[in-house]
Design a protein with these regions (language model features):
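Hydrophobic faces of well-ordered beta-strands that scaffold small-molecule active sites
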Residues: 23-27, 48-50, 77-81, 105, ...
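Aromatic- and acidic-residue-enriched carbohydrate-binding clefts of CAZyme catalytic domains
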Residues: 126
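Alpha/beta catalytic cores of nucleotide-metabolism and tRNA/nucleoside-modifying enzymes
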Residues: 2-15, 19-23, 29, 34-35, ...
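Alpha/beta enzyme core
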Residues: 90-121, 129-206
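Active-site beta-loop-alpha junctions enriched in small/polar residues
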Residues: 28-30, 53-55, 82-84, 110-112, ...
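Glycine-rich, positively charged N-terminal anion/phosphate-binding segment
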Residues: 6-13, 28-103
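N-terminal small/glycine-rich loop or linker at the start of catalytic domains
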Residues: 12-23, 56-76, 111-121, 140-148, ...
């Protein structure tokens, strides 16, 4: 892999915001909580984004929804909201920023899940571009930070309108767009269409963030060559592997790619994440959610099946500590 041919580059502009680096952590419901975002930011993510939060829930001051907006302690962090009513989205955006102090506001027009699109939210907005543009315009007027939009390639293979929608939201005041190279109907199946992302890049003058199928440093380099994108949003590839950000950043700059640390160090990072989660959500919820995260940290580790089974019944921080000690003792 020869990232040097792509030139030395390490920053991008998001409106008036200077971003050092080009990797973004994708907003993912049930995954990108404050603890995981803090870990990813510390290990090299240039930008992190909160889990998506309902605009209606924010307007009604729902405490659980409000708790999702906690900003990372460092780095650039955006708050993502979803909804389909311009006035409600504007009010929610202003409140989200007041509550979180986020560096930018992201509008979700990409979530493909039925419970979201059936309400006209998420990727359903790709079928109503005029409404989508009105939402962006209303939110831009309501906040003083850059506004970005997360979208997909389109609704289905017969309506791949990301380039057209990107132009509309740019005209409405968006400072950047992130594009997942799959349609709504594809969900996460098949292969991300990076050529569709290139079409968006060629249609707008604002930064374009490429999303979909970036699982390695080599993927990031290939994605940049294929799309010409300004930034690269990492999603499922980061599960249990927050070191992917530093690897991608190095590859994109043509530098030597750092190796993943040994298992003992990876376990220590997992423990740090779970401590942060307990601080943020309390021990009970943190331990329930640690089950999936801890299993992800052990992906690809030989002979880890025994510990993965034990992880599935974690209920206390003491359980986590005991399992971590066993892993460090028995596995490599």
């Amino acid at each position: 892999m020869d990232g040097s041919k792509l030139g030395k580059w390490a920053s991008m502009k998001l409106g008036t915001l200077d971003i050092q680096g080009n990797t973004w952590l994708a907003p993912m419901a049930g995954v990108t909580d404050w603890a995981f975002r803090c870990v990813c930011q510390a290990l090299g993510a240039a930008v992190t984004v909160t889990e998506m939060v309902s605009s209606r829930a924010l307007v009604y001051r729902d405490k659980k929804s409000m708790s999702l907006l906690r900003k990372t302690d460092g780095g650039v962090c955006g708050a993502q909201i979803f909804g389909n009513e311009p006035s409600v989205m504007a009010e929610a955006a202003a409140f989200a920023l007041e509550l979180s102090g986020a560096d930018f506001l992201d509008i979700n027009m990409g979530c493909p899940m039925p419970k979201i699109v059936n309400n006209g939210d998420g990727s359903a907005l790709m079928r109503d571009p005029e409404r989508a543009a009105r939402i962006v315009e209303a939110v831009v007027k309501a906040v003083s930070v850059p506004v970005t939009v997360k979208m997909r390639k389109g609704w289905d293979k017969g309506s791949c309108n990301a380039a057209e929608l990107a132009k509309l939201v740019e005209e409405a005041g968006a400072s950047a767009v992130a594009v997942h190279g799959r349609t709504k109907t594809m969900l996460y199946s098949g292969v991300a269409d990076w050529d569709a992302i290139r079409a968006v890049k060629e249609s707008v003058s604002i930064p374009v963030i490429a999303n979909g199928d970036i699982f390695s440093a080599e993927d990031a380099v290939k994605c940049r060559a294929r799309t010409g994108a300004d930034g690269f949003m990492l999603g499922r590839g980061t599960f249990g592997d927050p070191w992917l950000f530093a690897q991608c950043e190095a590859a994109l700059r043509g530098e030597e790619i750092p190796a993943r640390p040994p298992l003992s160090e990876r376990v220590d990072v997992a423990l740090r994440q779970f401590d942060l989660a307990a601080e943020d959500k309390g021990e009970h919820i943190a331990c329930l959610e640690a089950r999936k995260h801890f299993a992800w940290y052990l992906r690809g580790v030989p002979y880890s099946g025994y510990y993965k089974e034990k992880i599935s019944s974690i209920s206390t921080m003491d359980d986590i500590a005991a399992i971590a000690a066993g892993i460090k003792r028995d596995l490599r």
